[in-house]
């Protein structure tokens, strides 16, 4: 279970707390190995540790409606895309919906060159990308943190946009745009696959031309 937790959702270290008799090397009654329930990760024989990993269709369906009516959408993609192995799905989603995407430092270099791949946003990014976010009417955060490297001024960050945050775990939203963010607690790859399966081809030629002009 600890190994599963460390690799699923938002990967990271897991602290194992041992009972004091074991930690102090005292005698302890341990189950024989054949009585321990083993986890078969390859065959998905995994305890139900994270209910939030399952697709929450209601939240994704709300995002689909917003995508369908949006005229100036943009995606902010981060290292969670790489951790989920969802690079192909991100590109497929972007091509299907004609939505340009920016990549944070944790994803830069993992996505191929493409007209929809705008590169870095925020304090280390390109001015035109920040202009695109500022003038957007829909921002889709996926696999990226809501940090101050991109959200330089919360009051001026995409002031006229809906903001969706696709994040499989529930770390909370600890910044000044929390009241504007719609949380979608879904794995990046699964969410993109669901969106691809339930969206039709969309074009945003005028929006892309506007971004190019900047």
List the predicted regions and their residue ranges.
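Conformationally flexible catalytic loops at phosphate/diphosphate-handling active centers
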Residues: 5-69, 208
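Anionic-ligand anchoring segments at beta-strand to alpha-helix junctions in alpha/beta enzyme folds, i.e.
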Residues: 55-56, 62-139
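Short beta-strand segments
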Residues: 15-19, 76, 141-143, 167
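Short acidic, glycine/serine/threonine-rich loops at helix termini
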Residues: 26-31, 85-89, 112-117, 150-154, ...
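Short internal beta-strands
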Residues: 17, 98-105, 164-167
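Phosphate/diphosphate-binding loops
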Residues: 122-173
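Phosphate/pyrophosphate-binding active-site segments
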Residues: 41-46, 50-51, 58-61, 65, ...
């Amino acid at each position: 279970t600890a190994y599963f937790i460390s690799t699923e959702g938002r990967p990271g270290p897991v602290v194992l707390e041992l009972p004091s008799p074991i930690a102090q090397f005292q005698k302890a009654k341990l189950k024989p190995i054949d009585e321990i329930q083993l986890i078969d990760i390859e065959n998905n024989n995994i305890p139900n540790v994270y209910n939030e990993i399952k697709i929450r269709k209601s939240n994704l369906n709300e995002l689909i409606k917003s995508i369908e009516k949006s005229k100036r959408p943009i995606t902010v993609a981060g290292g969670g895309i790489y951790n989920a192995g969802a690079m192909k799905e991100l590109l497929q989603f972007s091509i299907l919906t004609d939505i340009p995407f920016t990549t944070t430092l944790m994803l830069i270099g993992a996505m191929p060159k493409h007209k929809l791949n705008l590169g870095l946003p925020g304090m280390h990014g390109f001015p035109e990308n920040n202009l695109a976010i500022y003038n957007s009417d829909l921002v889709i955060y996926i696999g990226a943190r809501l940090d101050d490297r991109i959200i330089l001024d919360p009051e001026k960050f995409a002031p006229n946009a809906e903001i969706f945050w696709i994040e499989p775990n529930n770390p909370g939203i600890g910044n000044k745009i929390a009241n504007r963010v719609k949380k979608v607690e879904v794995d990046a790859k699964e969410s993109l696959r669901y969106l691809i399966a339930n969206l039709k081809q969309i074009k945003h030629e005028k929006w892309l031309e506007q971004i190019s002009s900047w």
